[in-house]
Amino acid sequence: MRWKDEGVIIAVKKYGDKNLILSLFTKNHGKCRGLTRLTNNSNYKFQISNLLHAEWSAKLPENLGFLKCELIESPFHHFFQDRLKSIAIVSFSSILEKVLPESESCIKLYDNFRHFIDVIKHNSQFWQSHYLNLELLLLTQLGFKLDLSKCAVTGVKENLQFISPKTGRAVSKKVGDCYADKLLPFPQMLHDVYNNNLQNSYSYQEFRLGLKITGYFLNKYLFLQLNAKFPELRNFMLSFES
């Protein structure tokens, strides 16, 4: 079996002295892993976030397979001096590595991930909104879409200030005030991102509130179900001092 595709490196693991096991998020074949040979001149090629032309081959689809790779773009030098941006890209890559099913195409998520890397690369002030959008989209693509469009109880679309931790649905201030200690806050940044408004600037504290919400549901719906540990780098984003 053989195919060719483009893909972003989401994990790299050394295998022996001269080989690597690469995990790629590809446009048409989803997440795939393969063995590739490490040469003296290829270290720069195999960095997380690098975009590659990849040729994967194996006797059977379920085999690890072999990867021949050509570098298309290495965006790493655009953000490596910004610690939070670097952590964000590596963190989301590690989330993809843990939760994406093997060999299942997720073209919309792939395109948005590529766009997020471009946003980071061009030093956009709105990159944090694009990051939260990625995590919401990941939940949606894997079947756990949050419904933050209206109050779960009354159906109203105004004054949505809480989120139910059980259902992932929004709750209005009027309904939720009496149960505030049992509900999650619904920060304005997350409200805007959910409604596809990604062009507003927010404080890091507001971004952190959004991270807490998306992180809660990523852990509940994906990591706990897979009996997998939530990535330490993702947790570190919450304690990062801007």
Curated annotation (Swiss-Prot):
Coiled-coil stretches are: none
Name the InterPro entries for this protein.
ARFGAP/RecO (IPR037278), DNA_rep/recomb_RecO_N (IPR022572), NA-bd_OB-fold (IPR012340), RecO (IPR003717), RecO_C (IPR042242)
Sorted alphabetically, the keyword list is:
DNA damage, DNA recombination, DNA repair
Query: What is any one GO biological process for this UniProt entry?
Result: DNA recombination
Q: Does the keyword Amino-acid biosynthesis apply?
A: no
Q: Which SUPFAM superfamilies match?
A: ArfGap/RecO-like zinc finger
What are the record's GO terms for cellular component? bacterial nucleoid
Entry keyword rRNA-binding: no
Question: One Pfam family name from the record?
Answer: RecO_N
**Gene3D superfamilies named in the record:** Nucleic acid-binding proteins, Recombination protein O, C-terminal domain
Biological role stated in the UniProt entry: Involved in DNA repair and RecF pathway recombination.
Could you tell me which PANTHER family the record lists for this protein? DNA REPAIR PROTEIN RECO
Q: Which NCBIfam families match?
A: reco (TIGR00613)
Put simply, this protein is called DNA repair protein RecO
Q: Which gene encodes it?
A: recO
